Each structure stands twice: as structure tokens, then as C-alpha cells.
């Protein structure tokens, strides 16, 4: 699997928690701040944090834990 992305914003405590969960799950994702892109902000504004797989376009919305991340990546 390639292209794992975590969408969030700065000063988002849930996004910080999501990053910790990814670390716990051993997953590496590119962090993209949606506040820097109007289209992303419109699409994800109230849904963040969201984990997205670039290969499939599948998304995992918050809340998630390490087990859910592992299942998502399987």
C-alpha cells in the first residue's frame, strides 16, 4: 500500500490523537493540513481527522484505534 494520507489541521487535538494511533499501529502517513487547500477544507472540514489510502481511495474516519487502522491497512 502506498500513498497513505492523514488529513487534519494544526491545533486539532483529535488530529494529534490520530497521529499517535497511527504511530501505535506502525503506520506511516503523509500529514496534509486541509486549511491550506479550499477544496480539501470544504470536503473534510468537519470530518477530520481522516485517514485515506491513495491506492484505493478508501477512507477511515475518526474515531479509530490501532486495531481499526490495522484492519484498514490489511
Model-predicted segments: where are they?
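Small/polar loops that bind or transfer phosphate-bearing groups
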Residues: 7, 32, 61
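Thiol-based oxidoreductase modules, predominantly thioredoxin-like and allied folds used
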Residues: 28-38, 45
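Short amphipathic alpha-helix with an adjacent loop that forms part of the alpha/beta core around
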Residues: 42-43, 70
Amino acid at each position: 500500500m502506498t500513498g497513505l494520507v492523514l488529513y487534519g489541521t494544526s491545533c486539532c487535538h483529535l488530529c494529534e490523537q490520530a497521529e499517535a494511533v497511527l504511530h501505535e499501529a506502525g503506520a506511516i502517513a503523509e500529514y496534509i493540513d486541509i486549511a491550506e487547500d479550499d477544496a480539501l477544507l470544504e470536503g473534510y472540514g468537519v470530518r477530520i481527522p481522516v485517514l485515506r489510502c491513495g491506492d484505493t481511495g478508501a477512507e477511515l474516519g475518526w474515531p479509530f484505534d490501532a486495531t481499526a487502522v490495522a484492519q484498514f491497512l490489511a
